[in-house]
């Protein structure tokens, strides 16, 4: 029998990528509003470019937040602390253009005290559909390509901030991983792309020689540390700074905006995306909270060994608490003689997907042990610090199918 063979690619970007700088500022602003007032309604967008940060959006809150202070703190934490970067924490301009949220939206979302069930009192913040996904490719139950891509740029940032080796690194970086699959199983890594911003070449060293040093350092200290050795072979291709010199980067090299890295934030293209970005949005916005809940559903279904893959779609109408629809697809991998309809029926009873129930379950209005800024670089999923990654419904799912 012939084997099914194909290639699949995912990419990631570092915390210093301009779009991620914007995401982190937006989420840091959200964190502070929620810290002061857990009932805050926030939709915060950030624009970054050469020497400039603009923060805008809609807010309803009792809190008072120093936007300039937060933006400068985030930029400092990322590492833009030198004037030569043309975007520097202490000297960049910071403009706040936040204003009040529309009362028309408030009317549909805020609590309706006359309704008996408290979880029915809070409507969805908007219409739309959200997706969650899980699979058995990695211990985190995430697609392997995006996990490797995230870990590559995260490792680069760790090395840069430690400052012991590769001291030429600057904050902006991108990664991309191509996997070869045989019969739907990861067989090997076919290609790795890493582009990292760096200092000018040292005096007396040519560009070609400096790029050769960078290539060797990244392969040895980043790629081979992150990617399991058994997946690398003599045919794996390494594209390290493939265009050569990469000195100009960050917001000086490219303008950044909140919400432009939604595939990096999720599953690297291995699963559908409803189109709504996450960062800067409070948890009443189902673009964010329902995507987290959908991941929780999918991950628990896979962790319970009901299927090897699971996609969950949930949809909402603005102002309505209960989902308009829920859809579960195990891509033909359901086990124990189960079908998708059976799994969906049980899941709908076990997982409450009303926005207020989601917020309560994960304490999304009062994060503890994590913050929204943490989500804004290196992925919202596949990281155990986040409550929606818990496999706390496995036993209940198994019991529902008499598998416990």
From Swiss-Prot:
The keyword Nucleotide-binding applies. The keyword ATP-binding applies. Its EC number is 2.5.1.6. One of its GO terms (cellular component) is cytoplasm. Residues 1-20 are annotated as: Disordered. GO terms for biological process: one-carbon metabolic process; S-adenosylmethionine biosynthetic process. Its cofactor is Mg(2+); K(+). Catalyzes the formation of S-adenosylmethionine (AdoMet) from methionine and ATP. The overall synthetic reaction is composed of two sequential steps, AdoMet formation and the subsequent tripolyphosphate hydrolysis which occurs prior to release of AdoMet from the enzyme. This is S-adenosylmethionine synthase. The gene is metK.
